[in-house]
Amino acid sequence: MKLKNQHIFVTGGADGIGRAVVQDVADAGAKVSFCDLNIEKGKAYEAELKAAGHQAFFTPGNVGVVTQMQDVHAAITKEFGDVNGLVNNAGRNAYYDPVEMTEAEWDDFMNVDFKSIWVTAKLCLPAMRKAKKGAIVNISSIHARMSYPNYFPYAAAKSGILGLTRNLALDEGKHGIRVNAVLPGFTLTPMVEDYFVKNPEKRSEALSVQPMGRMAQPIEIAKVITFLLTDDASFVNGADWIIDGGLSGRFA
């Protein structure tokens, strides 16, 4: 059990990739805490994990609100102690017109998809520095490398995560803290399914360009994230891990 007794905190852990990460790190022996906006689903998942013999703790929280994340951090550290590994997974889609999007909408979106990465890191880093060890995995997206029309400003936020990851990796490496990014391609999560419902033509379009002829399952992304949290990845720092089945290798 490569994460035995390690406290791993996952944002947006009640669904999608986050849910798969919570399960996978729990299976690896971690004490896993997670937050989510969906209180009912979060509590049910916590109960499910505990019934299976895992150490799990759920607390509700909106990553886009700093005070809520401060409360979340206080709750999870009270339950399991300092955070050893952080997975910044929470986020949402955006489909704005760059002219019609309001400043308030911009701020609300960026608070969730970009600023929250820094906020959670800021909360967890002091203990990691003191321990001279820690791991952070930031979930970006293949949209940081290439994107679709009418997806503004999702790609901007996901690209920003890569720069933030590099900054943190360079600054925190001397403290024994590794910071990496994961860039999933199309993954069959509720958020992606929601996108396909709103844009049904995109499902067949997405499948048509997939070199492997399918999309990823959340657990396939989670396995890489878990690896990056373990000592098996002890010299992996500041890296961008693209997990897209080869999609980004296409020219057209």
Model region roles, listed by residue range:
Residues 87, 173, 178, 236-238:
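Short, small/polar-rich loop/turn modules that mediate ligand/substrate recognition or access, typified
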Residues 97-110, 206:
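Substrate-binding pocket helix/loop in short-chain dehydrogenase/reductase
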Residues 126, 170-174, 234:
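Alpha-helical segment proximal to the catalytic Tyr-Lys
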Residues 141:
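Residue(s) in the substrate-gating loop at a strand-loop-helix junction
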